[in-house]
UniProtKB/Swiss-Prot annotation:
Belongs to the ferredoxin--NADP reductase type 2 family. It catalyses: 2 reduced [2Fe-2S]-[ferredoxin] + NADP(+) + H(+) = 2 oxidized [2Fe-2S]-[ferredoxin] + NADPH. Its cofactor is FAD. Homodimer. This is Ferredoxin--NADP reductase 1. PANTHER family: THIOREDOXIN REDUCTASE 1-RELATED-RELATED. Pfam families: Pyr_redox_2. It comes from the Bacteria. SUPFAM superfamilies: FAD/NAD(P)-binding domain.
């Protein structure tokens, strides 16, 4: 890759904040690139494809999978260059002020500005710490719920006591034959309303209890029973199950910010310290979505869109100081005239 391939803005991360950054930068006629570690765009929403999302203004309840589909379609409106399966490991800057992004495969990407939209970082589920557990990942040991129907009429045990574990248990309760939740602590730690729903349902909660062994059936391919250990009494019990779901949180890979030669101001050694305009401590480098922290920050998908728009506006003015502070609203923008005519035609046919 040569330096002639210089982009106006490079967005690191292809989740909601990154995709909206790509859309809005295209709207502002900026040459845009997205670099995403995963083999697909959409970000963390892939973890909960069938969950209903209610808190995006103007949208009725929508599944995670459908939202990803719409976000990707919008994000690619202006045909940004998309680089998948590449992990950005460092950001440097040359004597001319150009950002150099280096990936784990050795690729180099050059950009006038950068928007970091890595969300919670590169997430990897914390695996069940039991020897040999990995062999059941192809059968009935799950680290996410991709399809609720898969668990219909089955006996399911969910290990974990945080928001995701409780949400999954609540979602599965009306579908599954029986749902158990096991948690190593004495009290669940999710949102109050979700905990109340769980405790008032048919789900059986096993607190102060952990899965300590996975026992295969005769074919040795799937888990047939789990061994449970109560941490208060030491009592060991066994439970016959069809599916095991593990939600013990995620490991965050923060290599990008740890390896950066730029002195990016951080909060709690994780968040990028910024302001309401999505500016970081480095001129020309912006942040959007969950990675950004400042007073008044809204930690919702809707807030990520707001961050993205602000980041793009500041990036545009950084490159072109006499540019308008804000992009033109879509209802008056010439770039949508042809597409609007097509949509109107479809509406009246």
């Amino acid at each position: 890759m040569n330096k002639e391939e210089l982009f106006d803005v490079t967005v690191i991360g292809g989740g909601p904040a990154g995709l909206y950054s790509a859309f809005y930068s295209g709207l502002r006629e900026m040459k845009t690139k997205i670099i995403e570690f995963q083999p697909h765009l959409g970000g963390k929403i892939h973890v909960y494809p069938e969950k209903m999302i209610w808190d995006i203004g103007g949208l009725p309840p929508i599944t995670g999978a459908k939202l990803i589909e719409q976000l990707v379609e919008q994000g690619l409106t202006f045909q940004p260059e998309v680089v998948l399966n590449e992990k950005v490991e460092s950001i440097t800057r040359d004597e001319y002020g150009t950002f150099l992004l280096t990936t784990s495969s050795g690729q180099q990407h050059f950009s006038k500005t950068v928007i970091i939209a890595t969300g919670s970082g590169i997430l990897k589920p914390q695996k069940l710490a039991i020897e040999g557990a990995e062999r059941f990942e192809v059968s009935n040991l799950n680290y996410t719920v991709k399809s609720l129907k898969h668990f219909k009429d089955k006996t399911v045990i969910v290990s974990g006591g945080g928001n995701s574990a409780i949400d999954w248990a609540n979602e599965l309760e009306p579908l599954a034959k029986k749902v158990y939740v096991t948690y190593r602590k004495e009290a669940l730690s999710g949102h109050e309303a979700q905990i109340t729903q769980l405790l008032n349902s048919s789900v059986t909660c096993l607190l102060n209890t952990s899965i300590t062994k996975l026992i295969a059936g005769e074919n040795h391919e799937a888990i047939e029973r789990v061994e449970l250990t109560n941490h208060e009494t030491g009592e060991i019990s066994y439970l016959s199950i069809d599916e095991v779901i593990i939600n013990h949180g995620y490991e965050r890979d923060m290599t990008l910010l740890e390896n950066s030669e730029l002195n990016i101001e951080m909060i709690d050694n994780y968040f990028i310290a910024g302001n309401a305009n999505s500016e970081s401590s480095i001129p020309g480098l912006y942040a959007a979505g969950d990675i950004l922290k400042h007073d008044g920050k809204l930690h919702l998908i809707a807030g990520a869109f707001h961050d993205a728009g602000n980041a793009v506006n500041k990036a545009k003015q950084f490159i072109q100081p006499d540019a308008s502070e804000y992009g033109m609203v879509s209802s008056h923008n010439d770039v949508f005239k042809k597409r609007n005519r097509e949509l109107m035609k479809q509406m009246i046919e």
